[in-house]
């Protein structure tokens, strides 16, 4: 009897260890860098990090930021998803290494907003704030993936509301209300949530930053890009195809990259009223 009892105890112990090991394997692991960020962030900011995604479109080789709402949908800019359909878009949450895929997408280029429905329900999500504009001088922040930074956790950018503007994304389109922020918004931050620094309720969507170049300089760069004369060089386009470019086009590429990456501490965010109106008009299309 004693021997049988000992064997039974050993079997139960082994089964318990195996069950614990299996549970540990099934639990998603948080990347070390993300855990450092979570540990260092305050409780308000920490709650937002897990709902901010790195948005990537392999087909168009574009990237930006997106965020999960409480209703289960993901918001980003229309220009972040340009050239891709829902099935081609991939989102990487900071809370795990598991990619998020999408089944449906709607967008409005005039407002520069897009809504995507994940194929699998996602935990968490951010709330939209009150539709009252923040006062000039109010501290705001955003989490995102600027420039060539690809994570695993988003980076924090902070600033202050400096004013408001009406922006037309396309000729003849309606004017869209933007918040002007004196914050470091860079390519890659596009589509990220704009928060009041005191809480994690969404007050807008990061969309652009101001640049140094006046229109005449941009026109000169465009002319260089269209030049077909001069020395020819072998290069690779954004899709990996071999191409030939002229000397003038190489100069234009360098100037364009400088234009994109030059740090200017003024950015823009689509207002909350525009975001709410967009969601209300498009949400039913994702059901």
Which functions belong to the PLM regions below?
Residues 124-180, 185-193, 206-220:
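Flexible, gly/ser-rich surface segments that form the specificity/activation loops bordering the active-site cleft
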Residues 5-13:
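Sec-dependent N-terminal signal peptides
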């Amino acid at each position: 009897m004693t021997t049988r009892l000992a064997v039974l105890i050993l079997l139960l112990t082994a089964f318990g260890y195996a069950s614990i090991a299996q549970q540990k394997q099934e639990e998603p692991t948080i990347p070390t860098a993300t855990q450092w960020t979570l540990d260092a962030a305050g409780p308000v900011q920490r709650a937002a990090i897990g709902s901010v995604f790195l948005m990537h479109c392999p087909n168009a080789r574009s990237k930006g930021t997106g965020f999960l709402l409480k209703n289960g949908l993901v918001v980003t800019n229309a220009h972040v998803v340009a050239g891709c359909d829902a099935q081609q878009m991939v989102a990487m949450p900071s809370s795990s290494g598991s990619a998020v895929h999408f089944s449906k997408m709607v967008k409005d280029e005039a407002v520069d907003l897009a809504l995507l429905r994940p194929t699998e329900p996602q935990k968490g999500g951010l709330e939209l704030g009150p539709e009252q504009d923040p006062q000039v001088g109010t501290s705001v922040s955003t989490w995102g993936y600027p420039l060539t930074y690809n994570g695993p956790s988003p980076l924090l950018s902070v600033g202050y509301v400096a004013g408001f503007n009406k922006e037309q994304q396309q000729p003849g389109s309606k004017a869209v209300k933007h918040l002007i922020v004196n914050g470091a918004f860079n390519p890659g931050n596009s589509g990220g949530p704009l928060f009041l620094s005191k809480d994690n309720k969404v007050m807008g969507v990061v969309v652009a930053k101001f640049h140094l170049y006046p229109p005449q300089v941009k026109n000169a760069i465009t002319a260089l890009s269209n030049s077909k004369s001069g020395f020819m060089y072998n290069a690779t386009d954004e899709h990996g195809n071999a191409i030939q470019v002229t000397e003038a086009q190489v100069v234009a590429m360098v100037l364009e990259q400088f234009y994109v990456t030059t740090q200017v501490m003024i950015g823009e965010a689509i207002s909350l009223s525009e975001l709410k109106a967009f969601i209300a008009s498009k949400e039913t299309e994702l059901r």
